[in-house]
Amino acid sequence: MMKMRWLSAAVMLTLYTSSSWAFSIDDVAKQAQSLAGKGYEAPKSNLPSVFRDMKYADYQQIQFNSDKAYWSNLKTPFKLEFYHQGMYFDTPVKINEVTATTVKRIKYSPDYFNFGDVKHDKDTVKDLGFAGFKVLYPINSKDKNDEILSMLGASYFRVIGAGQVYGLSARGLAIDTALPSGEEFPRFREFWIERPKPTDKRLTIYALLDSPRATGAYRFVVMPGRDTVVDVQSKVYLRDKVGKLGVAPLTSMFLFGPNQPSPATNYRPELHDSNGLSIHAGNGEWIWRPLNNPKHLAISSYAMENPQGFGLLQRGRDFSRFEDLDDRYDLRPSAWVTPKGEWGKGKVELVEIPTNDETNDNIVAYWTPDQLPEPGKEMNFKYTITFSRDEDKLHAPDNAWVQQTRRSTGDVKQSNLIRQPDGTIAFVVDFTGTEMKKLPQDTPVTAQTSIGDNGEIVESSVRYNPAIKGWRLTMRVKVKDAKKPTEMRAALATADKTLSETWSYQLPANE
């Protein structure tokens, strides 16, 4: 028996050291497919109570010792740092290093961390693990490593480019989001990170995803720059049927903005990580959906075939729109998903969840396919996610786009020039764009508008806006039942062509 075990180990070593050996997503997919055929085993917490019961301020005290960054003794521009377990990050994840010839487990050591004022028994932490990791790269300055990627919790990851700060998150997979049965949160249980060469400008990460009803193999190629791009390939296997599968999910926060002003006096005009969902539909239409913080859970679906892209965007970068010196919402990136290949029929879905403060992510967007295979069958998805502050990259170059949506009390100007509220709600939508700016001011621009059964458009008008060299649409809307949401759409056009993307808005229920 011992001889056979030694022989098996020798065979494995030969495979790993063979010059033809190379780790790939297929190696992870074999594990994912095998897991899908077995019953789900929930991860078990190994945390002592002092770490399990700690508050966020205590968890923040546990800092990685930057002088011990992984690969710090190599010439590669990428470095790794790790997150310690604590709070709800209570189960360890395995992290491996992949080289040209081997796969090696990166072992946890408490020596990696400075625990601050957190009192703990050193013997109780020696057998703990990592909760996740972060990637550092000299993205802003050649002589300084800055954090560009964080993978921590469930299948969440955050990414930034040059001059950006963390904002919205991406996820590996979403299951049954906003369904009455409750959402299932898959988690990355193991990672494999390729050791980069000194000249490499991209980093490859593999991940094994697991949850009660799905498993998956993921390959992330991270390409840092002015815009950081993550190339994603996934192979997903269902253990059991799901109500809804969310592919390429994005998670963000919207508290208030001009389309939904703060109910309390606030020196910040806007407070959000993203202010709209942008969609490039399979038929070529561009759609802009401003975000809400509703009083009740709200879901908006956009059915289409073979989407060309979608994303949660932060449109408008002037500091005066946010006035927040601490959180710098003006520097938070937009995230744009570009599918590779044909994704078939399905929906881009937007979920908006009520929140009272900015600490809760209350916005989710994802692609959900109409048809799902039987459990055990492989699903393949390939796409890129671009994290950018470049407005011009995130809308059609020849289309006008919505610069701002403002909501106001509807009114009518009286003969004495005093404005009198008339029981309507007014929406003021500014459109601009490179081609639109070339149009003469007297161009006969009109609005194509529509509203759902719960509302009536009392008046709509379009006028030239010299401040932005664009056009302003003003609509006064009368809502029939305030307990129900009201859907609206609008676009600008001339007699012979459409000039703008489609403004699509849901006025939330008010009760």
From Swiss-Prot:
Signal peptide (UniProt feature, chain positions): 1-22
An annotated GO cellular component: outer membrane-bounded periplasmic space
Pfam family, one: MdoG
InterPro entries: Gal_mutarotase_sf_dom, GH-type_carb-bd, Glucan_biosyn_MdoG/MdoD, Glucan_biosyn_MdoG_C, Ig-like_fold, Ig_E-set, MdoG_OpgG
Top-level division of the source organism's lineage: Bacteria
Family assignment from sequence similarity: Belongs to the OpgD/OpgG family.
Known function: Involved in the biosynthesis of osmoregulated periplasmic glucans (OPGs).
Name by which UniProt lists this protein: Glucans biosynthesis protein G
Source organism of the structure: Escherichia fergusonii (strain ATCC 35469 / DSM 13698 / CCUG 18766 / IAM 14443 / JCM 21226 / LMG 7866 / NBRC 102419 / NCTC 12128 / CDC 0568-73)
